[in-house]
């Protein structure tokens, strides 16, 4: 592969923020050996950062150190380079040393979000859940709009079977990114796991509303549910059954159960039948259709 094609390929990965480490390392090594990064001007330093991360990913720490040294020499007090140095340390140093390195940086600059998140990541890998939660809560008090931080907190709570707390963290995610149906689906499934079925069915229906192409009755009957819409209809079906089995079911969020439960169950059944009756290019989902048809045909209660 020529130097020019390697440069173009690496630039494409940077533009897409892709982390194809093997290919980046292979092309980046060619550029580094031929001194091509010097021709990139200011983009050359971004290239070195890209190659550093790829080298760490593929275990070529010698090349990572070579790139890091060039960056440190050029930007001796850069917070961005400090973060790269920390990531490099994580590959070989004990967690205690890495945590101290991050703590020293945060003591000098408590607003360094990247370093703070790396520290949280290391703490989680050590299994110190209490410390991770405390650190993450402090981080989110400072950087409330960090969606990844709230998702991390929700995941930690869920891993400890604290689904109510996980759902609370996800409500902040929905406030920050209300247009993302995947986060709404995650919140719906978390509500279902915490047995708040009225809230869960409401959120599953929200996912359907967000992912349907149109609200018209005609399209609703003719369109084929795909992707997370199918998953949301499964959620509606499951919630309808659980609510029907217990008429006195209480919702921790004080969400009222839907009055038209039977109609929702019938609609979910019809939508799932359509999804699993698809053919042609969309037919992959049709695998196991007989099992699905038998399941959805079961009585509501």
What does each model-found stretch correspond to?
Residues 71, 104-105, 138-139, 172-173, ...:
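Canonical positions in the second alpha-helix
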Residues 57-58, 92-93, 126, 160, ...:
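Structural motif corresponding to the intra-repeat A-B loop/turn of tetratricopeptide repeats
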Residues 47, 80-82, 114-115, 149, ...:
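TPR alpha-solenoid repeat register
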Residues 75-76, 110, 144, 177-179, ...:
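Short coil turns that delineate tetratricopeptide repeat
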Residues 1-38, 44, 183-301:
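Eukaryotic alpha-helical solenoid repeat scaffolds
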Residues 52-55, 89, 123, 157, ...:
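Residue at a conserved register position within TPR or TPR-like alpha-solenoid repeats
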Residues 50-51, 85, 119, 153, ...:
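Structural register within alpha-helical repeat arrays
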